[in-house]
Amino acid sequence: MLFSLLELVQWLGFAQLEIFLHISALLVFTVLLALKADGFAPSMSWWNVFIPFFTADGLSTYFTTIVTVRLFQDGEKRQAVLRLFWILTILSLKFIFEMLLCQKLVEQSRELWYGLIMSPIFILLQLLMIRACRVN
């Protein structure tokens, strides 16, 4: 069963606009990945394929900064700090995963093993499980 938008907003801590932004980035990434995998864009590097995710992370960070400033102005300092910490933690872990995966795909180095690449995702899943228990 799929989650409702309200549940996603509560569990992830993202606003509806941010969720739409990340889903749009996933759609564009999927198209670029298909083009790269099928050989229609052989000159496109893996860094270019991941640009939608990097852009979505940057825009989400910008949006979070705006929301944090607004919450501080409204006097809700505790909520502002908690939201800022939570969103920046999620975005940082996601960004680290994307960077490590791009580096592995470009260089094919043996120093980057997949356990190391997936470790930010494992940490993120643990944090999301704790947050889901706290919210409900």
Curated annotation (Swiss-Prot):
Cystine bridges: none
Bilayer topology term: Multi-pass membrane protein
A cellular component annotation (GO) from this entry: endoplasmic reticulum
Subcellular location: Endoplasmic reticulum membrane; Endoplasmic reticulum-Golgi intermediate compartment
Protein's UniProt keywords contain Transmembrane: yes
One Pfam family cited in the UniProt record for this chain: Tmemb_185A
One GO biological process term: intracellular calcium ion homeostasis
Ranges annotated as spanning the membrane: 14-34, 50-72, 81-101, 112-132
Coiled-coil region list: none
Primary location class: endoplasmic reticulum
Keywords carried by this UniProt record: Endoplasmic reticulum, Membrane, Transmembrane, Transmembrane helix
Top-level taxon of the source organism: Eukaryota
Function as written in the Swiss-Prot or TrEMBL entry: Involved in the regulation of cellular calcium homeotasis. May act as a regulator of STING-mediated inflammatory signaling in macrophages.
Record-given protein name: Transmembrane protein 203
Provenance organism: Xenopus laevis
